[in-house]
C-alpha cells in the first residue's frame, strides 16, 4: 500500500523516531496540487488503498478536505491514517466513514505527558465506544528500549477489547551509529521481546511485526516452539511472529515534493521523482532492483553466507537499513564497470 506524506511537522518529538530525516526539520506541507497529482499517480493501475502519513498527518491544514476527496474517489478502495491520535477529535465525521481505518501509534505517558496521553485515550473512547470503530482501529507500539514500560498499551488493549497490536522493533540511527552487528542486535532484544509476548499472551493479545522482524535463527529451538504454540492459540490464518521470513517489500512513500522513497527506513538512501515513472509498481520494481536485490546477496555474518532462507530471498536479516552502506558500495561498483 503506497503512502502520501502530508507534512513534515509533528506535534510530538519522540527521540526514537525513524523519520528524523524529515520530521520537524522543516515545516513542509504537501500542496493541494501535489496531493491531487499523487492520488492520480497512485490510482493509475486501478483501485488502491491509500495511507496518509507524516510527521503527523492530521496537522495538515487541508486534512479534512483531503479525507473527503479520498472518500469520494471511486479509485480509492480504502484509507489508512497513521497518527499519534492527538487530533482525531477534530475529524470525527471523516474518520468514522466505512472506508477509513486508523493506526494509532501509542506512546507512553512517561514520554508524551499525562495530558497528551489522556487526550489520545479520550479520542479512542469516542471512536471505539461511540462510533463502534473497534474493528477499524489498530494500536501500535514502538519497542525502542529493553527498559520500556509497556503497561500502558496493555491497559489500552484491555480497555477496548482488542486482540492484536502492531509492534515495531526500532532500528538504530544508521547515520551516526556506524556498523552494527545485526544478529547481535536482535539477540540483545530477545529477552525483552519474549517477556513482551508472554505479557501479551496473558491478556489474550497477539502482536504482529510492522517491519524489522528478527531473523528466525536468533531464537533457540525452545523459544521457537514457545512462539509457535503461542500463535497457534489464536484464530488467525497466519502470523508473522513465526516462520523463516524476515523480509519486507517496498512500501513507496510519496513526499510533499512528489519524490518517492522505498520506505522511511531507507529514506536517505535514494529518492526518485514520481514524474519519471508510469505507476507505483514501476517505482517498487526500481527499488527492488536497486536495493532489495543486493540486500539478499549481502550476508549479515559468516553464518548467513550459507543460509538457505537468504539464498531464496526469504531473509534479509531484519531492516534493510542495516545494510544501506554496503548496498551503496555495491551499486557504485556496478555503475563503475
Where are each of the predicted segments found?
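Flexible mid-to-C-terminal extensions adjoining Fe-S/redox cofactors in radical SAM and related proteins
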Residues: 259-337
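A C-terminal junction/extension of Radical SAM enzymes
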Residues: 174-269, 310
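Radical SAM/AdoMet-radical enzyme domain recognition
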Residues: 27, 32-53, 60-186
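Short, solvent-exposed loop/turn segments at secondary-structure junctions
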Residues: 11, 57, 86-87, 109, ...
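A structural signal for short, well-ordered beta-strand segments
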Residues: 2, 6, 139, 250-252, ...
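Activation segment
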Residues: 14, 61, 113, 262-264, ...
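Canonical Radical SAM [4Fe-4S] cluster-binding loop centered on the CxxxCxxC motif
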Residues: 1-33
Amino acid at each position: 500500500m503506497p503512502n502520501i506524506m502530508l507534512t513534515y511537522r509533528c506535534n510530538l518529538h519522540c527521540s526514537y523516531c525513524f523519520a528524523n530525516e524529515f520530521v520537524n526539520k522543516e515545516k513542509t506541507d504537501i500542496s493541494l496540487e501535489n496531493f491531487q497529482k499523487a492520488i492520480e499517480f497512485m490510482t493509475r493501475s486501478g483501485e488502491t488503498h491509500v495511507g496518509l502519513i507524516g510527521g503527523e498527518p492530521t496537522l495538515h491544514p487541508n486534512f479534512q478536505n483531503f479525507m473527503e476527496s479520498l472518500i469520494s474517489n471511486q479509485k480509492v478502495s480504502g484509507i489508512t491514517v497513521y497518527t499519534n491520535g492527538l487530533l482525531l477529535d477534530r475529524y470525527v465525521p471523516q474518520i468514522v466513514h466505512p472506508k477509513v481505518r486508523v493506526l494509532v501509534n501509542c506512546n507512553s505517558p512517561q514520554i508524551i505527558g499525562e495530558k497528551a496521553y489522556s487526550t489520545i485515550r479520550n479520542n479512542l473512547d469516542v471512536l471505539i465506544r461511540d462510533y463502534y470503530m473497534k474493528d477499524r482501529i489498530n494500536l501500535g507500539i514502538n519497542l525502542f528500549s529493553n527498559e520500556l514500560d509497556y503497561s500502558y498499551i496493555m491497559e489500552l488493549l484491555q480497555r477496548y477489547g482488542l486482540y492484536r497490536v502492531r509492534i515495531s522493533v526500532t532500528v538504530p540511527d544508521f547515520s551516526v551509529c556506524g556498523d552494527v552487528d545485526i544478529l547481535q542486535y536482535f539477540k540483545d532484544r530477545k529477552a525483552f521481546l519474549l517477556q513482551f509476548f508472554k505479557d501479551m499472551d496473558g491478556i489474550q493479545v497477539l502482536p504482529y511485526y510492522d517491519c524489522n522482524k528478527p531473523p528466525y535463527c536468533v531464537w533457540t529451538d525452545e523459544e521457537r516452539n514457545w512462539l509457535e504454540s503461542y500463535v497457534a492459540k489464536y484464530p488467525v490464518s497466519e502470523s508473522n511472529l513465526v516462520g523463516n521470513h524476515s523480509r519486507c517489500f517496498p512500501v513507496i512513500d510519496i513526499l510533499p515534493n512528489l519524490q518517492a522513497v522505498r520506505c522511511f527506513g531507507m529514506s536517505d538512501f535514494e529518492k526518485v521523482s514520481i514524474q519519471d515513472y508510469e505507476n507505483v509498481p514501476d517505482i517498487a520494481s526500481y527499488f527492488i532492483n536497486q536495493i532489495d536485490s543486493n540486500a539478499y546477496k549481502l550476508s549479515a555474518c559468516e553464518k548467513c553466507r550459507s543460509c538457505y532462507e537468504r539464498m531464496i530471498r526469504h531473509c534479509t536479516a531484519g531492516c534493510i537499513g542495516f545494510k544501506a552502506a554496503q548496498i551503496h558500495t555495491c551499486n557504485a561498483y556496478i555503475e563503475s564497470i
